[in-house]
Amino acid sequence: MIGRRQLVTVFRRYASQNGVIGQDHTLLPPLMLYRRILRAHKLLPPMQKEMGDKYVKSEFELHRTIDNPLHIVGFLASWQDYLHQITNGKWKEGSLSPAVLEKMSPEQVGQLYELMKETEKVTKGDNPEEDKGKNKI
């Protein structure tokens, strides 16, 4: 893992060139960001909190050993944007720009589509597990 000072330098250079986040935001260290996200999840409904906690924990664990500074910066910047969405209450209104969608692989787009469909089922009250139980009676 690279040092914090080197990481911040790379992040500032990358952010200024690509407009990742505004000038008033600074990059949070990974552990602090992780803890703030988990605290912010307490504001979510129980189902979203549970799903969010599991996802955040697995993603941070998977990215623990990354050494590429640009990957680290992109990862932390994306999660910091997510944190701002949750703390501002805009998590339900989030949408992807066409530019972000174009950068995704076909596999990622497929996963996103499946997630969208499952989310729609939950918000509409359709629960396939409940339906299976009803058919057995």
Swiss-Prot record:
Superkingdom of the organism of origin: Eukaryota
GO annotation, biological process: carbon utilization; gluconeogenesis; mitochondrial respiratory chain complex II assembly; regulation of gluconeogenesis; succinate metabolic process
Subcellular location: Mitochondrion matrix
Classification via CDD domains: Complex1_LYR_SDHAF3_LYRM10
One GO CC term, this protein: mitochondrial matrix
Region Disordered, annotated ranges: 117-137
InterPro entries: SDHAF3/Sdh7
Keyword Chaperone: yes
Keyword Transcription regulation appears in the UniProt entry: no
Subunit structure: Interacts with the iron-sulfur protein subunit within the SDH catalytic dimer.
Family statement drawn from the similarity comment of this UniProt entry: Belongs to the complex I LYR family. SDHAF3 subfamily.
Protein name: Succinate dehydrogenase assembly factor 3, mitochondrial
Species per Swiss-Prot/TrEMBL record: Candida glabrata (strain ATCC 2001 / BCRC 20586 / JCM 3761 / NBRC 0622 / NRRL Y-65 / CBS 138)
